[in-house]
UniProtKB/Swiss-Prot annotation:
Belongs to the lyase 1 family. Argininosuccinate lyase subfamily. This is Argininosuccinate lyase. SUPFAM superfamilies: L-aspartase-like (SSF48557). It is found in: Cytoplasm. One of its GO terms (molecular function) is argininosuccinate lyase activity.
Length: 461
């Protein structure tokens, strides 16, 4: 007999039972579901809906179920549909008729909204811990390589010289914003919907704030329809997760490129590489490639839930059963990705020589030469044209700007003087860009300190 079967004259079709059931995946919410039921039962006892003895009997029964699930002693039933009904059925079997009172003043609609918020709050905290560990590794790399010079790119073409530290600090800023998005999401989801009922609250004088406080929420939802019908908190998490995965994917894309024989900027540790079944020489950056590939999976989770929610009238609809698998998948994917990217970064070797050689080619110092002329009162557009012609001149001769003689420079502009050679040295080019946020060692050191300060605010020390 279904716990809701009073108005039905026959049982649900077996095909519908299987199609309708969500226990195969929402059993993952067992801890949150039982936590919520314990807090609800305790509150029912406090307000006199249950006697103290009944409340305690229910609470002890729920604690026993929680222990047995953790120890693998429970076999969930598809016929009981979902985690809520499975737990309530188990409770009634253990404590008798009093177990049927646990659902007083409550609907599965507010129950599942509570469970999902509790789950996401916990997983966001864990995700932040993993992201902070990655961010610290990025900062360590930046500290170590403030004078490791490399080419910066636009359009994947060499553009201007920077330091590897500066490049890493770009990702540090991205990951810092990712932390902020996760923090903001957690703050907005941390309100309790319990007490919203199916959609219109309840006639029982529930102490919603009491339950919210016991479960660690900052407050309660203030509209019962909204409390059960929206999943914007889950969508916000999936959005933050998608952006985080995008940042991880971009980093991994660069590691894949940099580890090629054409770049040789980094050497991936054997522990984070794989071989080929046919080509003995291969060392493939499969971990980085997989993170890049899994990013699309998280995007799909976001789009799937957006699509589920877009046409739903208020309040709860069965479509919303489809919210959990997307959330679970995204949580697992981002956490596993963070777990492998951090040690992959930490163990890779940076080829300083290859980076420095790369910085010297491709006329990365051309902008600095144009700036040299502009500082001598040549209008920048004229300076740009002069240097462009010098680049063409060098390209035809197979040499760099630094290989030209002063006479060759002066054939293009009499403003050039002996001091130009200092201004186009790669190290000088980087060091002169000491504007806040720039690539000079001083600017990067300042950025590292600022980032560490912000990170301390996240970690509380």
């Amino acid at each position: 007999m279904k716990l809701w079967g009073g108005r039905f004259e026959k049982s649900t079709d077996a095909l519908v039972e299987d199609f309708h059931s969500s226990i195969s995946f929402d059993q993952r919410l067992y801890k949150q579901d039982i936590q919520g039921s314990i807090a609800h039962a305790r509150m029912l006892g406090e307000i006199g809906v249950l006697t103290s003895a009944e409340a305690q009997q229910i609470i002890e029964g729920l604690k026993g179920i929680l222990t047995d699930i953790r120890e693998g002693k429970i076999q969930f039933e598809i016929g009981a549909e979902d985690i809520h009904m499975n737990v309530e059925k188990l409770l009634t079997e253990r404590v008798g008729t009093v177990g049927k009172k646990v659902h007083t003043g409550r609907s599965r609609n507010d129950q599942v909204a509570l469970d999902l918020r509790l789950f996401l709050r916990e997983e966001i905290d864990h995700t932040q811990e993993l992201l902070i560990a990655l961010l610290r590794t990025v900062l360590d790399l930046a500290k170590e390589h403030q004078e490791t010079y490399m080419p910066g790119y636009t359009h994947l073409q060499k553009a201007q010289p920077i330091s590897f530290a500066h490049h890493m600090m770009a990702y540090a800023q991205m990951f810092l914003r990712d932390l902020g998005r996760l923090k903001d999401t957690r703050q907005r989801l941390n309100v309790s919907p319990l007490g919203s009922g199916a959609l219109a609250g309840t006639t029982f004088p529930l102490e919603r704030e009491m339950v919210a406080q016991e479960l660690g929420f900052d407050g309660i939802t203030w509209n019962s329809l909204d409390g059960v019908s929206d999943r914007d908190f889950a969508l916000e998490f999936l959005s933050a997760a998608s952006i985080l995965m995008m940042h991880l994917s971009r980093l991994c894309e660069e590691l894949v490129l940099w580890s090629t024989g054409e770049f040789q900027f980094v050497i991936m540790d054997d522990g984070y590489s794989t071989g080929s079944s046919i080509m003995p020489q291969k060392k493939n950056p499969d971990v980085a490639e997989l993170v890049r590939g899994k990013t699309g999976r998280v995007y799909g989770d976001l789009v799937a839930l957006l699509t589920v929610m877009k046409g739903l009238p208020l309040a709860y609809n069965k479509d919303m059963q489809e919210d959990k698998e997307q959330v679970f998948d995204a949580v697992d994917t981002i956490q596993k990705s963070l777990l492998v990217v951090e040690p992959m970064l930490r163990t890779m070797k940076v080829n300083k020589k290859a980076m420095a050689e790369g910085a010297k080619g491709g006329f990365t110092n051309a902008t600095d030469l144009a700036d040299y002329l502009a500082k001598k009162n040549v209008p920048f557009r004229e300076a740009h044209e002069i240097v462009g012609k010098l680049v063409l001149y060098c390209s035809k001769r197979g040499c760099g700007l630094e290989d030209l003689t002063l006479k060759e420079f002066q054939e293009h502009s009499d403003v050039f003087a002996e001091d130009l050679f200092e201004s186009i040295g790669i190290e000088y080019c980087v060091r002169q860009r000491h504007i806040p946020g720039g690539p000079s060692p001083e600017s990067v050191a300042q950025a590292i300190l600022w980032t560490e300060h912000i990170l301390e605010q996240f970690t509380g020390g």
